[in-house]
C-alpha cells in the first residue's frame, strides 16, 4: 500500500466552508471550479489567492474560473473572519489517494503503481508537475456490492516522504523511491505468454501484510488497448470475497502473477459485479515508465 500526492499548478475548489460558504455559493462558485486568476493576478497555488485577499480586504474580487472547457468571471465579496478575509471555500492543489505498488526496479529505484492515470475534477488526466509517495496502511474496508463499489481506506504511515513521483500516465503513476522495498524478484511476462485461466493477485487488505489471492483471467484483449483494460478478471478466492466482496478502490496496481511471472496489475472494478474487474499488461506499464 502506498500513499500518493500529485500536485500541479492549478487551484481547485474542493468544498464549501460550513460557516462562510454562502459567499461562494451566492457568487456562483462551484465545487470543481479551477481558479485561474483573482483580480487579474494569475493563480498557481492557494497562497496566490490568500495574498490578494489580504491586500484587498473585504472589497469585492473578480475570479476567473475554468469550468470544464469554459472560462467564467465571477464577482465575490469576501467574508471577514478572525483569520482575515475568506471566500468561503476550501482549495485543493492536486490530488491525494492510495494505491498498491505494482513493480519495483531496485537497480533504477523505479516503481509503478495504479495501472491507470489520476484524473482532475473535469475527468481529464491530471497534468502533474510534481508529486510525493508515502508509506501507507489499510485502516478499514468498505465491502463492495453490486452497484456500490467498495473501498480500502488507508492513511499515511511514517513521518517522511518515501519517494518522488515524476509521471502520471493513462498506464499508471511512476516514481523513484528513496529507500526501496524488500522482496523476491520475478520475471515479467510478454503479451504472448499470458493465458486465460488461474492467476494470483497480491494486495494488502488487512493489517500490514501483503497476501496472495486467487483470481481467474477470463479474457485477454488486444495489446494495443491503452485504457488500462487489457485483461478481464474474476476474483475466486473465498477469503478476499469475504473481506472485500471482490475488487475495491485502493486495490489499483495490485500485481497479477501467473505461472511465476508478473503479467500486469488490477486497474478497475465492474460496478455492477465487484467480483470482476480489469487489469493492464505489465508491458504497457513498463513502456509508459521508460
Per-range role (PLM):
Residues 2, 30, 50-89:
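PDZ-domain C-terminal substructure recognizer with occasional recognition of PDZ-binding tails
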Residues 2-31:
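PDZ/PDZ-like groove recognition
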Residues 10, 29, 46-53, 98, ...:
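Extracytoplasmic/secreted envelope proteins and their assembly/folding machinery
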Residues 18-21, 36-40, 87-88, 187:
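Second-shell loop/turn segments in exported
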Residues 24-47, 256-259, 263-267:
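Conserved PDZ fold ligand-binding element
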Residues 24-28, 51-54, 191-192, 244-247, ...:
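Short, surface-exposed secondary-structure edge patches
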Residues 37-70, 273-275, 279-283:
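PDZ domains, with a preference for the canonical peptide-binding region formed by the helix
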Residues 80-245, 249, 258-259, 267, ...:
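Serine endopeptidase catalytic core focused on the charge-relay Asp
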